[in-house]
Curated annotation (Swiss-Prot):
It comes from Cupriavidus necator (strain ATCC 17699 / DSM 428 / KCTC 22496 / NCIMB 10442 / H16 / Stanier 337). The RNAP catalytic core consists of 2 alpha, 1 beta, 1 beta' and 1 omega subunit. When a sigma factor is associated with the core the holoenzyme is formed, which can initiate transcription. It catalyses: RNA(n) + a ribonucleoside 5'-triphosphate = RNA(n+1) + diphosphate. Keywords: DNA-directed RNA polymerase, Magnesium, Metal-binding, Nucleotidyltransferase, Transcription, Transferase, Zinc. It is an enzyme of class 2 (transferase). This is DNA-directed RNA polymerase subunit beta'. It comes from the Bacteria.
């Protein structure tokens, strides 16, 4: 009996822990883990297959092979448990101890651990302050290192070759100094380090030195040494004296059939180490010559290196099959390593997979599960039921019963499955809607049935897709699956809050067809009393679906909510002019929605809006029911409509021939011009591509116009146009299938095709698919098609990698509190570009929390108080009262440490309410950005040719009526003709309405002519400014006579004759094409006043100097009188090289990796006045003198165009040299808010181009994570090192601690890290190691003696705990609270006991004596 009880004891309680620490193991520690030394390289005996004693699989060291049975068989069974057999020395216990018992090898010579040697930066090198090369020479016995110089002039840790050593021995005599080779030498050096003293020394040197490089070097070394000091790890432990041996079950040797064995590579590696070690021991005993011993020691070092990390140094060790052996390091790193394969990617019990088919009869929360699959998945539940019902007495009997599939089993299965949700998953699971829970409905057959409306979320179709089924087993799991994951509870996309259950294809077509109207349909103009009358008329064929009729329709308006919160509705009957189809459809409308939402043709977008409105007005349940009804009606009506397409539906426009002929003629004209040398080949190509592009568009337009309308006769007998009922047009117009571009290929012309490299082939395909392609045309079109397929494959991999990096950087961001109480936020405006509103203010602030009160601009009353979550009604209100800027909370300015607060995040888009505590918003953000990644292009766009020419604007006009206002940055001068010429680079014109609210804003480029004044009232359509689109002018801001400097023909400028006009102009030559002597000269012009003095910039003593950049055409002569606003030179924009803009996925990755772009813009570091200093070789020197008179210098490459000129006042962060912005500069000069604006806008631009909607807050969450580290500037009294990078929350905690003690806090600068870098530099080493660069991360963590607090999700998954998010957050909080209270209780009890013992001690004694007497 006792034995049985002991068995129960063996199931150990898993330990509760809050952190995991990693460190270096001392030799003593390794010996303490070990159960014995492995002395022989043998594994198992080839005849008996029993492990050899003292070998790598020794049962004495590692434990028995069979449960409770010693090796020789003397002791068997449980009763001998714990006995150690005296014959074979094996302890009688469970065989699974062979998974946990370790052995060790006593190394005859110490060896260095390769990770600390070779993983860059070399940790050994840092501690010893030696170069890696030197240490390697010592370790591999090529050089000596001085350990103890004694009285000689040698220095400690000096390296010398063998010859040197012998020479020095002769010089100073043997034994006067100690020098050693190999790991022993390094170990002695490490032992000799006095860490405390070193730290003091370095700190002193840090204070003293001024050089940047030295500070960096010292700081690095200091960090490592302080880590050693703090963690109590001794540096000499980086050298191994004892090698631990992995438990044998983790490096198994398994017999294959045919007498061969398969073994883990580790056994080979261990065997090599043991062989060499034993040989070395023997050589040392034999007192072999030094050179032989040295060689053996080197080989031992190499063997140990290979075991730890094969191939890290020198050639990798290979096995019998010439393949490099897989070492310990390879076991844990990479996709197939321990972390990603086994800890983060586990396989799941109780799962199955099958093909999916459509289940049109299912409700939204159901799925069809094949009976056989369900029987297998729910087996344990069925067994249990069979036993409780008494049908089967044992599990074995129950199994038999189930396998015979008797009717009673099916009944039980029905019962078991009732209300037990299952989870369906479709790979790739790109966002949280890729796994949803459904209630299973048992079906015959072998395919899973899926509801059509959830296909959009799963991105599933029925062309052979497969899905996996998982069964949640525990009650908690079932409950969570039902409440959080049930398909009917997930009707919105978490990425943007739009409904995910939108009908598509057939359903859309059916609904569209039903809600279209037509002129002069059967029964037009009839009036009906109610909908049943309409249905009766329709069934008797008195009216047709699209006929326009009048019907009395009952709508239900929301009156109020009663005590239970149920809505009360009041019916309202109105006569509506509508169509038969819409009236019939209105029967399924939920109460609370007006009929007007249906009284229009329902295209896909409209249906999406309809479901969205239903969700916001009527709630989740009604919406789901409504969506299901829409689906049923749509299918039914699509079937009734009987829409089909025939070749005749593709109408080829009659104008096509003419358009193509005209285009061909134009192309011939250009060819002629090219032949006669008037245009270059590139220009000809650009124009040809342009012409064909335009022709294709024209044909397409003509075709759409023809498809779109048809002529019909109305009731008066007149012929009128109405929207066409052409099947193809209806499909495209409704959004059911196809698009205008696809129809254009069917019935217009296919147009231009691209080569695989993305360049456009200049001969277009003039045919369409209806006419058919000839062989050449077919061949050209295969190009593009093939590239498309190759692109898709690449895109998927790249997109997946981006998602992985995003998830990794945000995985620990969870909503941990409701409100952090910050008063910071960001001011949101509508997004306007080129005068067009791209994103309205209402869309940007929906679902955010206000920071400040929103004030009605007309009455100045508070319309919405601070701290309000803006829902649809409130943004509508903001829109109506005309507020154009709202300050809202943002994840970026949230003050919560180690997480986010609900108020800063705002609405949980997937649920439509304020986010709950415990929501893993980081992962959701990562998924929302990564999931549409596959839809983005891989292309880098070539601007140039067709693309750019269409986009060049040369004027800007107002779209709204209002008043013109110029921004503060706008500067302009009036020229001789009285025109206003803009001389600012970043000026904008705003147009405001009567209340002074901004309606639109336009950038006005430098050199433009303004046609309006500041404060002028204008009508819509008024031109605001015009400019020359093809050249960029250089405008004079002063009046005077020109005086050229360095403008020498044939040196800095060249004369160009215009062939057509015969006029000559001077063009500035590229510095690279000049002779060496003249390279540094800049052509420029100064202005002289009437007295011949140089014109100065007002308020300074700088002369006005205007530099001409390369390629500028100088339009004035030397000594010419110029006026303010006159053009001095023009720079042709055509001569700017065609830039590649990175688009699509690479651009998103570039932004999130925070890469500095090539040729980045230079921004002004300070606010001040500019002037040019003396030029250096190939560089211009720009000086900005700030307001205090300090000069800041910039060196700018000669060929760059400097946007400022002498004496101009620039603001901090203003662009000085054109180019793409560098996010790091934006952060440094303009702050976090500007940076976030920049990244959000840039990322959104890429997605918007593809028509993907992502909410801004997801991108902000990622930016928050990119900004989570700071760099220490001034240490104050904190524990940090100058220039150290630390987590923001860690710094704030430390500063709080220091301030509380009344000391000086540290100051810091914000750091922007790319997502890969941010993931690797996270405080959790477990998370970082499982992401990338496993070796480096673990090496660093071990030396630092890091502790992982298991804050993020990933670390907890890896150690196998509940994640601290969702329901797990509450669990962990409760657990921590419980532990704290238990600790307090224990302490209280201890104190109580103590107090009892102290005071009444004598009394206790007395009573004892008394008792004794009585006894």
């Amino acid at each position: 009996m006792k034995a049985l009880l002991d068995l129960f004891k063996q199931v150990q309680q898993e330990e509760q822990f809050d952190a995991i620490k990693i460190g270096l193991a001392s030799p003593e520690k390794i010996r303490s883990w070990s159960y014995g030394e492995v002395k022989k390289p043998e594994t198992i005996n080839y005849r008996t297959f029993k492990p050899e004693r003292d070998g790598l699989f020794c049962a004495k060291i590692f434990g028995p092979i069979k449960d409770y049975e010693c090796l020789c068989g003397k002791y068997k069974r449980l009763k001998h448990r714990g006995v150690i057999c005296e014959k074979c020395g094996v302890e009688v216990t469970l065989a699974k101890v062979r998974r946990e018992r370790m052995g060790h090898i006593e190394l005859a010579a110490p060896t260095a651990h390769i990770w600390f040697l070779k993983s860059l930066p070399s940790r050994l090198g840092m501690v010893l302050d030696m170069t890696l090369r030197d240490i390697e020479r010592v370790l591999y016995f090529e050089a000596f290192v001085v350990i103890e110089p004694g009285m000689t002039p040698l220095k400690k840790s000096q390296i010398m070759s063998e010859d040197d050593y012998l020479a020095k021995c002769d010089e100073y005599g043997e034994g006067e100094f100690v020098a050693m080779m190999g790991a022993e030498g390094i170990r002695e050096l490490l032992r000799g380090i006095d860490i405390e003293k070193q730290i003091e020394q370095i700190r002193a040197e840090l204070q003293a030195t001024g050089s940047e490089a030295k500070i960096k070097k010292f700081a690095k070394r200091l960090k490592v040494l302080e880590a050693f000091q703090r963690s109590g790890i001794k540096p000499e432990w980086m050298i191994l004296e004892v090698l631990p041996v992995l438990p044998p079950e983790l490096r198994p040797l398994v017999p294959l059939d045919g007498g061969r064995f398969a073994t883990s590579d580790l056994n080979d590696l261990y065997r090599r180490v043991i062989n060499r070690n034993n040989r070395l021991k023997r050589l040392l005993e034999l007192k072999a010559p030094e050179i032989i011993v040295r060689n053996e020691k080197r080989m031992l070092q190499e063997a140990v290196d290979s075991l730890l990390d094969n191939g890290r140094r020198g050639k990798a060790m290979t096995g019998a099959n010439k393949r490099p052996l897989k070492s310990l390091a390879e076991m844990i790193k990479g996709k197939g390593g321990r972390f990603r394969q086994n800890l983060l990617g586990k396989r799941v019990d109780y799962s199955g997979r099958s093909v999916i088919v459509v289940g049109p009869t299912l409700k939204l929360h159901q799925c069809g599960l094949p009976k056989l699959m369900a029987l297998e998945l729910f087996k344990p539940f069925i067994f249990h039921k069979l036993e409780t019902m008494g049908i089967a007495t044992t599990i074995k009997a129950a199994k038999k019963e189930v396998e015979s599939q008797t009717p009673v089993v099916w009944d039980i299965l029905e019962e078991v499955i009732r209300e037990h949700p299952v989870m369906l998953n479709r790979a790739p699971t790109l966002h949280r809607l890729g796994i949803q829970a459904f209630e299973p409905v048992l079906i015959e057959g072998k395919a899973i049935q899926l509801h059509p409306l959830v296909c959009a979320a799963f991105n599933a179709d029925f062309d052979g897709d497969q899905m996996a089924v998982h069964v949640p087993l525990s009650l908690e799991a079932q409950m969570e699956a039902r409440t959080l994951m049930l398909a009917s509870n997930n009707v919105l996309f978490p990425a943007n809050g739009d409904p995910s259950i939108v009908p598509s294809q057939d359903v859309v077509l059916g609904l569209y067809y039903t809600t279209r109207d037509k002129i002069n349909g059967r029964g037009e103009g009839m009036t009906f009393a109610d909908i049943s009358e309409v249905i009766r008329a329709y069934e008797n064929k008195e009216v047709e679906l699209a006929s326009r009729v009048n019907v009395r329709i009952t709508e239900y308006e929301l009156v109020d909510k009663d005590a239970e919160g149920d809505a009360r509705f009041a019916p309202k009957i109105t006569l509506q002019a509508t169509t038969v189809g819409r009236a019939i459809l209105s029967e399924i409308l939920p109460k609370g929605l007006p009929f007007s939402v249906l009284n229009k043709p329902l295209k896909k977008k409209e249906i999406s809006r309809l479901i969205n409105t239903a969700f916001r007005k009527c709630g989740l349940r009604e919406t789901v029911i409504f969506a299901d009804k829409l689906l049923q009606s749509g299918f039914r009506l699509a079937t009734r409509a009987g829409i089909s397409i025939a070749i005749d539906d593709m109408l080829v426009p009659p104008q096509k021939e003419k358009i193509i002929a005209e285009a061909s003629a134009k192309v011939k004209e250009y060819d002629k011009q090219y032949m006669s040398g008037l245009v270059t080949d590139q220009e000809r190509y650009n124009n040809v591509v342009d012409i064909w592009g335009a022709a294709g568009d024209q044909v397409g337009k003509a075709m759409m116009e023809q498809l779109q309308h048809e002529d019909v006769v109305d009731r008066e007998g007149k012929t009128v146009k109405q929207e066409s009922f052409n099947s193809i047009y209806m499909m495209a117009d409704s959004g059911a299938r196809g698009s205008a571009a696809q129809i254009r290929q069917l019935a217009g012309m296919r147009g231009l095709m691209a080569k695989p490299d993305g360049s456009i082939i200049e001969t277009p395909i003039t045919a369409n698919f209806r006419e058919g392609l000839n062989v050449l045309q077919y061949f050209i079109s295969t190009h593009g098609a093939r590239k498309g397929l190759a692109d898709t494959a690449l895109k998927t991999a790249n997109s997946g990698y981006l998602t992985r990096r995003l998830v990794d950087v945000t995985q620990d961001l969870v909503v941990v509190e409701d409100d952090c109480g910050t008063s910071n936020g960001v001011a949101m405006k509508a997004l306007v570009e080129g005068g067009e509103v791209i994103e309205a203010l209402r869309d940007r602030i929906l679902g955010r929390v206000t920071v400040a009160d929103v004030v009605n601009p007309e009455t100045q009353e508070t319309a919405i108080e601070a701290g309000t979550l803006l829902d649809e009604d409130l943004v509508e209100l903001i829109d109506n009262i005309g507020v154009d800027e709202v300050k809202v909370r943002t994840p970026l300015s949230c003050d919560t440490r180690y997480g986010l607060c609900g108020k800063c995040y705002g609405r949980d888009l997937g649920r439509g309410v304020l986010v709950n505590s415990g929501e893993a918003v980081g992962v959701i953000a990562a998924q929302s950005i990564g999931e549409p990644g596959t839809q983005l292009t891989m292309r880098t766009f070539h601007i140039g040719g067709a693309a750019s020419r269409a986009a060049v604007a040369s004027s800007v006009e107002a779209k709204a009526t209002g008043t013109v206002r110029f921004t503060a940055t706008m500067r302009y001068v009036t020229n001789a003709k009285g025109e206003l010429i803009v001389i600012s680079r970043s000026g904008e014109a705003l147009i405001t309405d009567d209340h002074g609210r901004e309606r639109e804003r336009h950038k006005i480029p430098y050199g433009a002519t303004l046609l309006v004044q500041d404060g002028q009232a204008i009508k819509a359509g008024t031109q605001l400014a015009t400019w020359d689109a093809l050249t960029r002018p250089i405008v004079s801001e002063y009046t005077g006579t020109t005086k050229f400097e360095n403008v020498e023909e044939g040196v800095t400028v060249a004369k160009q004759m215009d062939e057509v006009t015969g006029l000559s102009t001077l063009v500035v030559i590229d510095a690279k094409r000049r002779t060496a002597a003249t390279k540094g000269i800049r052509p420029q012009v100064k202005l002289l006043d009437a007295n011949g003095q140089e014109v100065k910039i007002p308020g300074t003593d700088h002369s006005v100097t205007i530099g001409f950049q390369v390629g500028a055409l100088i339009t004035v002569k030397d000594g010419q009188q110029v006026h303010v606003g006159e053009v001095l030179a023009r720079i042709p924009t055509e001569s700017q090289k065609t830039r590649d803009i990175t688009g699509g996925l690479p651009r998103v990755a570039e932004l999130f990796e925070a890469r500095s772009p090539k040729d980045a813009a230079v921004l002004a570091e300070v606010t001040g006045t500019t002037s040019f200093g003396k030029d250096t070789k190939g560089k211009q020197r720009l000086v900005i003198t700030d307001l205090d008179g300090n000069a800041h210098e910039f060196l700018i490459a000669k060929e760059k165009q400097v946007l400022v000129h002498d004496g101009q006042v620039v603001n901090k962060g203003e662009m000085i040299v054109e180019g793409p912005a560098d996010p790091h500069d934006i952060l440094r000069l303009k702050g976090i808010e500007e940076l976030a604006h920049y990244i959000v806008d840039e990322v959104q631009d890429v997605y918007r181009l593809q028509g993907v909607k992502i909410n801004d807050k997801h991108i902000e969450v990622i930016v928050r994570q990119m900004l989570r580290r700071v760099q220490i500037a001034d240490v104050g009294d904190t524990k940090f090192i100058p220039g150290e990078q630390v987590e923001r929350s860690e710094l704030l905690d430390e500063n709080d601690r220091v301030i509380a003690e009344g000391k000086r806090p540290a100051t810091y600068e914000n750091l922007l890290l790319g997502i890969t870098k941010a993931s690797l530099s996270t405080d959790s080493f477990i998370s970082a190691a499982s992401f990338q660069e496993t070796t480096r991360v673990l090496t660093e963590a071990a030396i630092m003696g890091k502790t992982d607090d298991l804050r993020g999700l990933k670390e907890n998954v890896i150690v196998g705990r509940l994640i601290p998010a969702g329901t797990g957050l509450a669990y962990h909080r409760a657990r921590k609270a419980r532990e704290a209270s238990e600790r307090e209780r224990a302490q209280a009890i201890a104190e109580e006991e103590q107090s009892l013992f102290i005071e009444p001690a004598p009394v206790v004694q007395a009573t004892t004596e008394g008792e004794g007497d009585n006894a």
